[in-house]
Amino acid sequence: MQLTAVGLNHQTAPLSIREKLAFAAAALPKAVRNLARSNAATEAVILSTCNRTELYCVGDSEEIIRWLADYHSLPIEEIRPYLYALDMQETVRHAFRVACGLDSMVLGEPQILGQIKDAVRVAQEQESMGKKLNALFQKTFSVAKEVRTDTAVGENSVSMASASVKLAEQIFPDIGDLNVLFIGAGEMIELVATYFAAKSPRLMTVANRTLARAQELCDKLGVNAEPCLLSDLPAILHDYDVVVSSTASQLPIVGKGMVERALKQRQSMPLFMLDLAVPRDIEAEVGDLNDAYLYTVDDMVNIVQSGKEARQKAAAAAETLVSEKVAEFVRQQQGRQSVPLIKALRDEGEKARKQVLENAMKQLAKGATAEEVLERLSVQLTNKLLHSPTQTLNKAGEEDKDLVHAVAQIYHLDK
């Protein structure tokens, strides 16, 4: 089985497809363990973010696609048009580019590297990684560090979190006059909330499944932040001007009916809603309501492209470095694959040496001269070492030109 990657991202699939193939964080350990023990793969790492779902494996790409469709209970024909299946060298290049932020919606964004490290950690804990994937990701992290150190690809990067504030400022003139509600208390919400907190909104509320985690985030944000439970949302939604949601829920948390009731109480005051979750936390139909401004991760593209031109120049240098590192890694892996063959070849040579040496010792014992024995030994050793290659070439003739060329290369006869 070969190294391969199967997946889809913001470039190949819309949000409506990506959310169907997303893996919930809580389900990821069992999923990656299942994949690595299936007929599809012997090693596996699953990367699932708001912009991509990718399965890095040692296995058969077609079987991996089938496993992915079965896992999410989807017809394979429905997802196949959006998927890419990469061979070994393409997989290496793709992993390097993703980790460096070269394949991100926000060119050069740093969060993806942490997300890959989390995916690898989960796979290691589930013992779903072997020599090939360990080697790939060890090199991936090294390349990502080198690219970010030696190039400017990540400089002036507009993150999804900072873009959230920019988008809100296009609707409301002063964030300081607003009440902001954050649904969820994970890494993305913490990043977004930190940017909003810097603008000193009138009130910030963190709604979460557990009050303790919500309080923990509020403590980081400052005095004007308060916690609440998700179950409180229907009663308080109308009090907020901005709602940002990013949870791991597999079903919508905020429905159209809940927003309709909140808008009636707001009396035509606009409600800005940003859904950064995949699958979505807010029902898509909310976007049809008057005075509700609903945005998803796919709507953020234009905003996060700010400064892209400068980063693209740096990206050219990064791509060159990535290409060099891909070639280096592939050579290393091919060299490692040759080790058993090299050992077998040397073992055969040693076997032939011992045989002719044994014959030579017998000849000397019978009284043959050293010159005669050495001459006979050299002829026998030459014949033994060249017998198999000569026989194979005679059988191949000129039809197998690759074999002929390979033998010429091995013995340096192609100069």
Curated annotation (Swiss-Prot):
Binding site for substrate: 49-52, 104, 109-111, 115
Active site: 50
TM ranges: none
GO molecular function, one term: NADP binding
Keyword NADP: yes
UniProtKB keywords: NADP, Oxidoreductase, Porphyrin biosynthesis
Single GO BP term: protoporphyrinogen IX biosynthetic process from glutamate
EC identifiers of the protein: 1.2.1.70
Superkingdom, taxonomy of origin: Bacteria
Pfam families linked to this entry: GlutR_dimer, GlutR_N, Shikimate_DH
Pathway involvement of the protein, from the record: Porphyrin-containing compound metabolism; protoporphyrin-IX biosynthesis; 5-aminolevulinate from L-glutamyl-tRNA(Glu): step 1/2
Ligand binding (NADP(+)): 184-189
Database matches in InterPro entries: 4pyrrol_synth_GluRdtase, 4pyrrol_synth_GluRdtase_dimer, 4pyrrol_synth_GluRdtase_N, GluRdtase_CS, GluRdtase_dimer_dom_sf, GluRdtase_N_sf, NAD(P)-bd_dom_sf, Shikm_DH/Glu-tRNA_Rdtase
Reactions catalysed according to its record: (S)-4-amino-5-oxopentanoate + tRNA(Glu) + NADP(+) = L-glutamyl-tRNA(Glu) + NADPH + H(+)
Keyword Oxidoreductase: yes
Site entry (Important for activity), positions: 94
Role, per record: Catalyzes the NADPH-dependent reduction of glutamyl-tRNA(Glu) to glutamate 1-semialdehyde (GSA).
Family classification: Belongs to the glutamyl-tRNA reductase family.
Oligomeric and partner information: Homodimer.
NCBIfam families, per the entry: hemA (TIGR01035)
Domain notes: Possesses an unusual extended V-shaped dimeric structure with each monomer consisting of three distinct domains arranged along a curved 'spinal' alpha-helix. The N-terminal catalytic domain specifically recognizes the glutamate moiety of the substrate. The second domain is the NADPH-binding domain, and the third C-terminal domain is responsible for dimerization.
Miscellaneous note of the record: During catalysis, the active site Cys acts as a nucleophile attacking the alpha-carbonyl group of tRNA-bound glutamate with the formation of a thioester intermediate between enzyme and glutamate, and the concomitant release of tRNA(Glu). The thioester intermediate is finally reduced by direct hydride transfer from NADPH, to form the product GSA.
Protein's recorded name: Glutamyl-tRNA reductase
Gene source species: Neisseria meningitidis serogroup B (strain ATCC BAA-335 / MC58)
